[in-house]
Amino acid sequence: VVECFTSKKATPFSDTYATAGAKLIFHNIREAYGDADNMEAKNNMMLGAFYGGVAITGSGTTAVHALSYPLGKYHIAHGVSNAILFAHVMEFNKDACKERLAVLCDGVFPEFATKSVDEKADYMIGQIADIVKVTNIPTDLTEFGVKMEDLDFLVQAGSDQKRLLVNNMKELSLDDIREIYLKVLK
């Protein structure tokens, strides 16, 4: 949902659903993951995921999904590959979409209303990274059998996802893509 909100194709329609989905997801994922019996949190996650799907139909996805697609070769689940790359792509994009991240932060975390745009953008990216940590998603692609010698393939295959990369707020060069993958190849 954050990816939808920061897409070049974002619209007021997709923003409405992305914000609603983000609010539900950010405020329920820890409880839904940590407490198998918390049906309210799980139902909120389900509704948040639905809202995210509606948002995607209006805004499309960006570099997060573009760089995740080549990881399917290694049988990494789509959601896991997105999660591994998400905060790194958002950090790369931050200077081009920090205002959008700040607006989303206002909708999801109103208690940060008095913070600066940069603080709000950093907080949103930090929350993404924290969710990956709390849900025990591996952050190193080598855990899935990806090797450093696969880097050139990943860079080329990621850069070939033009239909998604054109939605990204910031253009990615081959070197930019390489740097993002290097952050998750330890």
Where are these regions (language model features)?
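C-terminal charged capping/lid subdomain of soluble metabolic enzymes
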Residues: 112-186
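Active-site pocket-lining segment
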Residues: 76-140
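Glycine-rich phosphate/pyrophosphate-binding beta-alpha loops
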Residues: 50-82, 162-164
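Alpha-helix N-cap/helix-start motif at coil-to-helix transitions, marked by capping-box chemistry
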Residues: 12-23, 80, 95-99, 122, ...
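Carboxylate- and glycine-rich phosphate/diphosphate-binding segment that chelates Mg2+/Mn2+
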Residues: 1-59, 169
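Short alpha-helical scaffolding segments that buttress acidic/His motifs in well-ordered protein cores
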Residues: 1-2, 45-53, 83-86, 128, ...
